[in-house]
Amino acid sequence: MAPIKTQESINQKLALVVKSGKFTLGYKSTIKSLRQGKSKLIIIAANTPVLRKSELEYYAMLSKTKVYYFQGGNNELGTAVGKLFRVGVVSVLDAGDSDILTALA
């Protein structure tokens, strides 16, 4: 069974990570988790500035971490993780009960 990468299913998987897993929000904490090698997946919003995005990609490449480009902007990513503010980057440290790491491979 191939994973369906629709926006709705990704939002559901993100919600499950928020409930049962460990994650960090934001650029600085994501860079920190990438440098420490704790991050398993980073999710970048579509409207993240190019310089910031390239820096995240560089650190992800060094730590061999998967990168997923979220289709919506930072408003939608914030809503997907259940926050009432904008979120540019989400770093998944532990997926918990979610299969987001295998689905977004």
UniProtKB/Swiss-Prot annotation:
The alphabetical list of record keywords is: Ribonucleoprotein, Ribosomal protein
> Do the record's keywords include Nucleotide-binding?
no
Q: Name one Pfam family in it.
A: Ribosomal_L7Ae
UniProt GO BP: negative regulation of mRNA splicing, via spliceosome; rRNA processing
**Which Gene Ontology MF annotations are present?**
pre-mRNA 5'-splice site binding; structural constituent of ribosome
List the GO cellular component terms.
Answer: cytosolic large ribosomal subunit; extracellular region; fungal biofilm matrix
- Give the family this protein belongs to, as stated in its UniProt record: Belongs to the eukaryotic ribosomal protein eL30 family.
* Name this polypeptide is given: Large ribosomal subunit protein eL30
Give the species this sequence originates from.
Candida glabrata (strain ATCC 2001 / BCRC 20586 / JCM 3761 / NBRC 0622 / NRRL Y-65 / CBS 138) (Yeast)
